[in-house]
Amino acid sequence: MNPNSDYTVEMSVDDIRLLYKSVCFHLEKWPGGDAVEQEYLHHMKGSLYRMILEHKFNEL
């Protein structure tokens, strides 16, 4: 399996909100360790937040 494979997943906005909350919680409780993993989590948090904002904008 290629570790650099990209995948597409369909999720509801509720799923995205839950995943965003989970990532935020994990970052708040970060025990230290792999800095690269922490960077990925920050990137994921930003991406998920942009999805939530886009959904809110489109609902106007």
Which residues does each PLM region occupy?
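Positively charged, low-complexity terminal tracts
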Residues: M1-L60
